[in-house]
Amino acid sequence: MQKEWLERTLLESDADFRVLISPNCIVGPDPSHGTVFKYPGGGADSHGDLGFGHEGREFRKWVHDKKLTNFITINGDRHWQYHSVDPESGLREFCCGAVTDSHSVKKEKYDPKYHRFLRLKGGFISVALDGTRQDPRLTVRIHDVEGKTVFESQVERT
């Protein structure tokens, strides 16, 4: 029911940009889970890894098939910061990371197939809508824990 609601709402939206804020990653990649973390479930807890990977692939394929080019996801339940693009669907994802540097994972590896940015520290994300009504731009900034911008990406309406 939730999935159908989300898909219908995204398709019916006439917004210049669609942003899904999720508690876990949909793109990832999320390879460090499983052996690094020792808690029930083994850490396979997202749509970007084996936990819910089949649902993640299904949703990313749906995004691609529906040509939702002005759609991004933002998540915060990874312990590193990143901007990734799914190589098959083109879905863009941003992760704010842990709220402190001390809670960051130090073993994540840059994956050029997905990552456009990877930082093994904490911080937060800000999003701004800039430009004009005729030429809007969504700017996503990833900040360190002190507020300094460490990465910036613009999403243009297509």
Task: Give each language-model segment a name.
Residues 1-158:
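Long, structured stretches of catalytic cores involved in phosphate-ester chemistry, encompassing
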